[in-house]
């Protein structure tokens, strides 16, 4: 057993996908959930491709349509506890573009209270109240 397998042994693995979505004005789609700025993402469903999962989650969490994947980005991992179980979430990220200019609709049942298009010059400010893996993901963008 290698170190990675040893590390993963005590966790329930959840695979998910999400998007760094940019509109025609090169603004980034961000969500506000649990008191932090984040990116739309969610769990992979059975027999769903990871790309379809990423697109579906952006649509569900933000109400954005007409999404096109540009490229796959780096994967991220984070751990948390849920119902006395240790969870390891593996997230596959995709850079996307959209021409959608309709209303943004936060998925309230998922705890999302805001969905915003964020100008490039305002991203750093939002990242002051975000997660380490999101900061790392956006470093090269």
Where are these regions (language model features)?
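Charged phosphate-binding loop/patch that engages nucleotide di/tri-phosphates or the phosphate backbone
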Residues: 129-141
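Acidic, metal-coordinating catalytic segment for phosphate/diphosphate chemistry
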Residues: 1-18
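Short connector loops at helix/strand junctions that flank enzyme active sites
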Residues: 12-17, 32-34, 89-91
